[in-house]
C-alpha cells in the first residue's frame, strides 16, 4: 500500500475583474499556499481610454466632459483640477460667491464618494445592510446635484473663472435640511458598524501601513492620514475658500484598515461642517468671471442682446495656454489628485499628465496582502478605495 502524499504545489487564483459597482475591472493574480497569500499581482489597463492623449487636442472647455469619466464617483474634483490649472496660468480671478459654491459642491461630492466606498467595503467584509443604507443618503446628494447642475453624475458644472450657473431658488435651504439629516445618518453608521465586534475582528490590525512606509510609497488622502500623518491639501495649499471655515483634519495613528475607515467616517462629518458654514456665509454677487466683468462695465446694450445671453455666456473664453509648466493639485476623496500641464502658446495643452491618487495608492497592495489570509485581500483592497476609471485613465 502506498503512503498518501501531501501536495505542496502553490495555487494560482484569478480574482476579478469584478462588476463596476464594486471594485471595477481590476484583476488580481494571487498565488496561494493553502489559505496564505504568497504573492499578488494587480493587472491594470482594462479601462484605459487614453485620457492624457485626448487632452492634447482639446481646448480646456472641450475637455471638461471627458474629465468626469476619470473618477466617476467624485466628478466635481476632476472638474476642479481641470480648471484650476488654466486659472493659475492665466491669473484669472474667481468671484467669492463662485468659490463658495465650488466648496459646497466639492464637499457634497466627497461625502457621496465616501458613501459609495463604505457600502461595497462593508459588503466585502460580509455586512450587507450598510450597502443599502448608503444609497438612501447618496440619493439625496444626487437630488441636490441634479437641482443645481442638471445632472446626477458627470455634472460638467465648473467653468474657468467660476461655475456654469448660480444656485437655484430654495437650494440652500434644501441643502441645510440634508446636512441636519445626514448627521443623524452618520451617527447611525457609527452605532451599526464602528463598535460591531465582528467588523472589528475583520479590520483591526489588518493591512498595517507604517508612517515612513506611507511616505515612501507616495500615498495620499485617507491612506496617508490613517498612518499618523496630518496632511490635507485643503489646509496646506489654501485653495478655494477653505481657510475661511472652521474644521479639523481627520487622522489616526494605527495605519490599519480600521484607521482608514475611521478617517473616512470622520471626514464625512467634517465635510458637513464645512458645507453648513459655506451655506450660511455665502456672499452675493456674480457666480463667474464673465458676470463679474459685466457688473464692472457701464450699462451697455451689447450685454443685453441675444448673442451675449444665449451664446457668449455659456462657454468660458478660450485663451492660449502660455509657454510654461504648472503642477496643480486638490485633495480628492481618495488622495492627492494632481495635473502637470505644459502650455505651448496654443489653445491645446502640449502635455497633460494626470496624477491619480487611486493608481498610486494601489501600488502598495501586493506588499500589504503578502502573508495574509485570502479573505483579507478584499478587506485590504476595500480599505484602499480605488476607482478603475481613475487608475487606468
UniProtKB/Swiss-Prot annotation:
InterPro entries according to UniProt: NADH_Q_OxRdtase_suD, NADH_UbQ_OxRdtase_49kDa_CS, NDH1_su_D/H, NiFe-Hase_large
Keywords tagged on the record: Chloroplast, Membrane, NAD, NADP, Plastid, Plastoquinone, Quinone, Thylakoid, Translocase, Transport
EC number: 7.1.1.-
GO biological process, any: photosynthesis, light reaction
One Pfam short name: Complex1_49kDa
Principal cellular location given in the protein's record: plastid
Domain of life from the UniProt record: Eukaryota
Complex formation: NDH is composed of at least 16 different subunits, 5 of which are encoded in the nucleus.
Similarity comment: family membership: Belongs to the complex I 49 kDa subunit family.
Protein name: NAD(P)H-quinone oxidoreductase subunit H, chloroplastic
